[in-house]
């Protein structure tokens, strides 16, 4: 899962030294965490190294050395996280002679992009929108895959709201900011943005059905809060930006460009292993349970396996319902990048000097193209 924090940072910059110092400290803490609290490649498998790859390509991947995967948010069972955990546990990385270490991210995309650019992480989950913002701010990373132009950000309302313009003049809750895709959806639907009262809420979605402090709508993630509310017996309407042709992304991945240039086969095969694991984890309820169990083992006793199973099944359904046009699973849609730039310009999140042509060069399908044949991931590797 990719938590889009960079938009908030862009819209609410500050030069106060105390905040800058705290931000630097937070980045340092995550960087320190990258030296420990991780799991090495193929921890739970008996597969033999190189069993799914030629000797020549195996040597190339071994020469790449240690590869650090940094998740978007802890070991949550989201697309872009669970399949990497499963690829490790099922031995797929080992099968391809890859030395992959998994690291849990904090949920702060801005930190992930900096760690990726500095080489402290090799590959990481970074939403397409966040990658554009990072590159616009001089952070050098490259987008290498995405599962869908749909996104995770949604707006929830109680059942008495049947059309979004009914929210005019009402209270809308958020977790620090209203995601650009949600605002774009609301404005496209005819909501008078300046009429809204925007309030920061915590992470308890029950404030919506309780209409706490007059709350009529609440932002969230399609795979999280709606499932929590449903489990509690609360029925809400979920408004998804993709239904209004608003751009976003799910499961997007980025790489350190210097590593990718030096070790292209390793980048290809990291994606190959992850996509092979994605297919495994999505194949049946039993295999989904198996994969979520791997994440639970890494996370500890407090891991909510039931909720995380719902997270995976919800996100993979959104991906299946909204395949990337003219692309295999993992392929990036250049037109979606153009639409994202337009949206970021609309809300002054990136400078007008950042063009769609600029942004398209920050993404590549070369690695996905290299591992795909007739729309399917090639396994084993050549």
Positions of PLM-derived features:
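Bacterial N-terminal signal peptides that target proteins for export
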Residues: 3-25
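C-terminal motif of bacterial Sec signal peptides marking the signal peptidase cleavage site
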Residues: 32-36
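Bacterial signal peptide processing site
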Residues: 38-40
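Short, glycine-/small- and polar/acidic-enriched structural segments
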Residues: 44-202, 206-212, 216, 220, ...
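Short helix-capping segments at alpha-helix termini
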Residues: 91-95, 189-193, 233, 300, ...
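Pocket-lining segment of extracytoplasmic ligand-binding domains
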Residues: 204-206, 211-304
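Secondary-structure end/capping motifs
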Residues: 263-351
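Conserved C-terminal helix/tail region of periplasmic/extracytoplasmic solute-binding proteins
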Residues: 337-382
């Amino acid at each position: 899962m990719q938590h889009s924090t960079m938009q908030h940072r862009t819209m609410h910059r500050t030069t106060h030294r105390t905040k800058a110092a705290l931000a630097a400290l937070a980045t340092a803490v995550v960087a320190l965490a990258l030296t420990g609290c991780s799991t090495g490649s193929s921890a739970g498998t008996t597969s033999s190294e190189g069993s799914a790859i030629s000797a020549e390509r195996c040597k190339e991947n071994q020469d790449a050395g240690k590869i650090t995967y940094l998740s978007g948010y802890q070991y949550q069972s989201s697309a872009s996280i669970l399949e990497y955990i499963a690829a490790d546990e099922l031995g797929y990385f080992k099968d391809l002679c890859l030395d992959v270490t998994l690291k849990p991210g904090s949920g702060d995309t801005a930190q992930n992009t900096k760690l990726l650019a500095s080489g402290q992480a090799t590959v990481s989950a970074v939403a397409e929108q966040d990658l554009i913002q990072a590159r616009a701010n001089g952070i050098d990373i490259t987008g290498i895959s995405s599962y869908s132009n749909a996104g995770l950000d949604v707006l929830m309302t109680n059942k008495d709201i049947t059309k979004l313009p009914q929210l005019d003049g009402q209270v809308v809750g958020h977790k620090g900011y209203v995601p650009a895709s949600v605002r774009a959806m609301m404005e496209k639907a005819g909501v008078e943005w300046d009429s809204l009262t925007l309030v920061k809420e915590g992470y308890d979605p029950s404030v919506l059905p309780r209409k706490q402090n007059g709350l009529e709508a609440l932002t969230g993630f399609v795979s999280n809060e709606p499932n929590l509310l449903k489990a509690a017996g609360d029925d809400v309407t979920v408004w998804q930006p993709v239904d209004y042709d608003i751009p976003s992304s799910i499961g997007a991945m980025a790489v350190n460009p210097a590593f990718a240039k030096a070790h292209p086969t390793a980048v290809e095969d990291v994606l190959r292993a992850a996509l092979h694991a994605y297919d495994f984890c999505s194949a049946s309820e039993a295999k989904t349970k198996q994969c979520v169990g791997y994440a639970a083992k890494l996370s500890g006793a407090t891991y909510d396996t039931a909720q995380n199973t719902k997270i995976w099944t919800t996100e993979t359904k959104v991906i299946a319902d909204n395949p990337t046009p003219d692309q295999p699973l993992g392929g990036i849609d250049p037109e979606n990048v153009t639409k994202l730039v337009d949206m970021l310009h609309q809300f002054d999140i990136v400078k007008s000097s950042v063009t769609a042509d600029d942004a398209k060069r920050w993404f590549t399908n070369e690695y996905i193209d290299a591992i795909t044949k007739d729309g399917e991931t090639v396994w084993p590797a050549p």
